[in-house]
Amino acid sequence: MEINEIVKKFKDQREVLAKKFLADVDADAYLSVHSKAADEAVLEILKLNGLSEAVAVVAVGGYGREQQFPFSDLDLLFLLPDDVKDKDLKTISEVIGNLWSLGLTVGYSVRKIEECLEQADIDITAQTAMLESRLISGNAELFKTYSDTIERSLNLKKFYRAKFIEQQQRHLKYHESSYALEPNIKEAPGGLRDLNLSLIHISEPTRQAEIS
């Protein structure tokens, strides 16, 4: 399948999904199916460009949760083995170029596991996204090592402290109020960011037990 065919298929799927959503208003179903449509497009592009199976292609953040909103960034991590080939790096660049053709903003990182750990240590947003990772294609063994390593490196008290500081700073931008003529339903108090923080906190009882 050529890139123009992949793009047309994806855009047609999005149109059908939008019409179905307006008829059914089932947000959970929409986000799940839209994420799967994005997966299909990504897989077709990976096949088109011939990316090596040595690389793990990972969905992160909302996309990793299979909650890909229609105009949200398509967030991907290209996870590299230690002995990555120059050819693979070139192919990744070609893949990223084709992904932009889908009409979505592509947020991406290209890292080895050690580099992921370094980034997680200095960037709470990146660390959060890494905790919501899902393998799309490629090196499953490398992905498992990455997931286990990220999980083991997680300092829960430090993580939640940083998340709540991040939340407080975000709330200050909106005067700590959810009331506005044009509320920001993603960033403002009580919005999607706060909902996601709550879901992260309650998602795994074992994590709660560790910090209680």
Task: Annotate each language-model stretch with its function.
Residues A27, L31, V84-D88, N184:
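Alpha-helix N-cap/helix-initiation motif
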Residues H201-S212:
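Single conserved hydrophobic/aromatic residue that forms the stacking wall/gate
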Residues D39-L89:
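Active-site nucleotide-donor binding segment shared across nucleotidyl transfer reactions
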